[in-house]
Amino acid sequence: MVVPRATRIGLAHVVTRVVFGLLRLPLRMMRTYRTQDRWLRLAAPISVLAQLAIFVALIICGVALIVFGQTNLTWKQAGWQAAATVTTLGTTEPVNWSSAMSSALGAFLGLVVIAVFMGYLVGLYSAFVARESLMARFAQVAGEPAWGPMILARSQALAGSPIEALDCAEWMTWMTDVRLGQQASPVLAHFRSPDPTRHWTVSMLSMLDATALASSMGLVADRASAIRCVAEGTITLAVLRRRGAAIETTNWRTERMVLDILDGSAGIDPEGARSIDDADWNMAVELLQQFDVAKRSDIESARPVFSAIRSLYIDDAMELAAELHAIKGPWSGGHSGSVDATSLDDCG
């Protein structure tokens, strides 16, 4: 069993960033987001293979140095013997007893790297499936790309309650799994969803928006769970944006901020807290009215509270969406380099 641990500094971060940065260079020459998404699907597999190649190369260099110091072989001969032993080809004969021990060690390390790599791939696949399965089910009510108000509207239409689809406990588990998986394996963030209209950053943002909006309008039955859900999402986005670095924000501190906003003791600035323009907000209001989620006056009065809660996580969500080149959807279009989902109809 391979059990990796989170780290702020490591080869995985460097390789993933370099590969993804290089693959982003030709995106401007691609006309549609679907083409861009298909191209960026190469980033994660290339990063994984590059990590394997680099680790094997480092072991070969280390064994070559040992062999060179123990024998009269040249650098080229020592390097060839190290490469043959680490890759278990067995095409060279040890020169002396010490070089034979070094060759055996190199062969063992080569097998260990391959075994660990196979376990690593299994772990990546399991984490990817766990992340995508809930998102696929979530898309049935959130739409693709996911949108917070759509969750409340469809839930109201299907179940007669706008919060029926907001399973805060399930989403808190999902967010913690996403955070743990991507802290342990940074390349997991770059594995893209099978559908180009779906992305984990947009799904997380829409779920937080739906929970924050429902809480602002007083629709949630279990306010404590909703507050914990928003706090967990806020911290998850902050940690992933900082690539696992330690942050000062704690669960209780974030929960307290949300609680103060809902209770009206946080000194809300209606103008400064707004992160959604009037056109996008009115579109959501019309949708919620159409499905009888709430009266227009109740929705409008909840806007300052909702915007203040949203300000806790929106910057980190947008930064991650921009960095990962996520699909642009309603209320998630603040990052550059994406297109609106409606243009996907014309994609080839």
Question: Model-flagged regions — what are they?
Answer:
Residues 26, 69, 125-128, 175-178, ...:
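Generic structural signal for hydrophobic core residues of well-folded globular domains
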Residues 142, 146, 167, 189-192, ...:
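Soluble C-terminal extramembrane regulatory/interaction domains of multi-pass membrane proteins
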